A protein has these predicted regions:
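N-terminal secretory signal peptides
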Residues: 24-86
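C-terminal segment of classical bacterial N-terminal signal peptides
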Residues: 14-22
Length: 142
């Protein structure tokens, strides 16, 4: 009897992640829908990517985004048959750790992560697009 009980308990414990996965996925979908330009997850991703860019491309080891202000959405392209990715175009003013203010433009793309789960964030800080990836003055993201 104790072996049967332990086997059942172990089976239930191993199946628990499988049962909770849809619930977690539901939470992720709700979270993803709630993401807007000022969502903390989006801003954290931008800040992290900017630190890497500042260190690796501009050789500014301590430069970071210190604060965001005037966050706004200026365009939203919803997902359609002819446009499979929903995109939210945003802008903001940032204060860098050296005290300088800059304009930042960014896009949040929905459903472009692994297996179409997750979002992608691309950004351009005015004056920091050394290779003109987003054209002069971050034009592509404006």
């Amino acid at each position: 009897m104790p072996r049967t009980f332990l086997a059942c308990l172990l089976s239930a414990a191993l199946a628990l992640p499988l049962v909770s996965a849809p619930a977690q996925a539901g939470w992720l979908w709700k979270e993803r829908e709630a993401r807007e330009c000022g969502h903390p997850h989006v801003l954290k991703r931008i800040s992290s990517k900017f630190r890497t860019q500042a260190r690796e491309v501009h050789h500014e080891k301590t430069l970071a985004i210190a604060d965001y202000g005037d966050i706004h959405e200026h365009r939203y392209l919803e997902k359609r048959d002819d446009r499979p990715i929903a995109r939210r175009y945003c802008g903001a003013e940032v204060t860098l750790s050296d005290g300088r203010g800059r304009t930042i433009w960014y896009v949040v793309e929905r459903g472009v992560g692994f297996a179409s789960v997750g979002d992608n964030v691309e950004f351009c800080v005015s004056g920091f697009d050394r290779w003109n990836v987003y054209d002069n003055g971050c034009r592509i993201l404006r």
